[in-house]
């Protein structure tokens, strides 16, 4: 990305996700466990069910893991994936997240799940992860790196963290390859970003730091379905949601979700599952 200072981008993301409105919205509409795009079996499937399916699809991409290292979750949100990773991998999980509000909820949920000793939640940016080189077998991220001030630097951190043979599995809302950023201005304005990554840019950033793209499973239709599903659910539950979320926030969210749906339908956006590997 490179056009936004990393600290400034961190501040924008933290301010947004730390707000009471955002915290309540993601808890009530997404279910309070995950904050990422779902893989839907049917158009009207529950958001939480579809979101959980994405986690399992990424777990399939990560399997099998090498032995001996830990797992790092970049942009861990409420920790839904971190808890699944802890149970699945049976090894330490380090959750990196900039939002103090999300991290507080994450820690409480870890205690409820009996996983507080296995999962360490770091109040940190994924551009400067407070961990040693070559310490992770798996780095994981879901729909978070778009908020980074320098996405190439995030890929460099991933390469630094991974042990030889380890892999990085992730999803991220992106621009379709070759799309001019001006065509995405309504989306960029909504999320306070100058641009989005693209599949080819992630491939190039990975190669520049020694990571090879092994899998690119394009599922852009799920981005469209997800944001449309969230918008429908928000509209149906408007009266209920207004008891804890401001009407202005809900109005802005409705408009923003519409921009994502339109961009996906117009072929200007891209989303899917990716795996990059550090050669052994």
Curated annotation (Swiss-Prot):
GO biological process, one term: glycine betaine biosynthetic process from glycine
Biochemical pathway: Amine and polyamine biosynthesis; betaine biosynthesis via glycine pathway; betaine from glycine: step 3/3
CDD domains: AdoMet_MTases
Keyword Cell division: no
pH behavior: Optimum pH is around 8.5 for dimethylglycine.
Domain of life assignment: Bacteria
Molecular-function annotations in GO: dimethylglycine N-methyltransferase activity
UniProt cross-references to Pfam families, sorted A to Z: Methyltransf_11
Primary enzyme class: transferase
This protein's UniProt keywords: Methyltransferase, S-adenosyl-L-methionine, Transferase
Function recorded in the entry: Catalyzes the methylation of dimethylglycine to betaine with S-adenosylmethionine (AdoMet) acting as the methyl donor. It has strict specificity for dimethylglycine as the methyl group acceptors.
Assembly behavior: Monomer.
Protein name per the record: Dimethylglycine N-methyltransferase
Organism: Parasynechococcus marenigrum (strain WH8102)
Lineage start: Bacteria, Bacillati, Cyanobacteriota, Cyanophyceae, Synechococcales
